[in-house]
């Protein structure tokens, strides 16, 4: 084992930004009222800081939708004792040891893997900084200097309001946009039809139901969407209904996209082999970090399935990490650029103020991937102090 570098310390930093003016989720979504109060009441993040003996620090992010304290406790009580003293260049060994400790004890998904994901991203970021290389090079090199983006997401609105939002997206240089659906067949189709009628082929459309349908209603919606040349139908049903995904994939002519709710190569193997999805959407801060995403993307590549990273409402740390991973993937399809926060009146400051190095917005629908060490970031101390839990 190499003793050239050693991890000296690990910190878990919980951040929360209350949302004061929030749009209510549509009543068609399962437990919509609970979603509003628990999930959508604030922007949350857990940032992981890994420090090497020489004082160099790497940063990662755990996908955090609820209970940041759970992630923080897992990192401190389970993962820190294992990782401290290890060589950050031996990320695979660290990952497997941490995963293996709890795998047989019922913790192969959920908070445990989200915590491991954030830690793993931070270790890779640290490794890149120690070696003075971007993570994309450590992963094997850049296939893409620029990443095509789609605008995400136009949320639940009346058709005329959706048209207004799409006009803004076009003016910002995007050629593709994702619409949130899940309100019911008639309302969903009316919104998609309004966009297609007003803009024709000027804009490409994806739709995302966030698991708002069952198989029967998803089939109804999907059949009606086919005539509007929708690029993909995302998370039409709950993520644990693998047979349902298989039925939708067999029956509909629209590619089924999923993956933001899945964990590790084992979960994605089932989603791909049994679920038959056509677009893979893992989140690096949930599915297992860089170490595990390399394995996941090897499986999807063998099946010829394109990769469209999920960023969602995570912070700029996840954005930076996903850019490095996407640049390295020969199967990269398109990048989710969140130009619409959960609250239009209150953009997420963890996207714009958290980093000292700002991520430049897309130009004509493309992001440029940088070559800075690691994932190319450091944290703004004032923002951390302001939103620290």
Label for each model-derived stretch:
Residues 140-252:
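Metal-dependent enolase-superfamily TIM-barrel catalytic cores that perform enediolate-based chemistry
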Residues 9, 51-130, 345-346:
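Metal- or metallocofactor-binding catalytic centers and their adjacent structured scaffolds
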Residues 2-54, 59, 63, 352-353:
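Structured beta-strand/loop patches that form or line metal/cofactor-binding pockets in enzymes
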Residues 26-29, 223, 229, 240-257, ...:
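Shared catalytic-loop signature of beta/alpha-barrel
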Residues 58, 149-152, 177-179, 205-209, ...:
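Hydrophobic faces of well-ordered beta-strands that scaffold small-molecule active sites
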Residues 345-389:
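C-terminal extensions of enzymes
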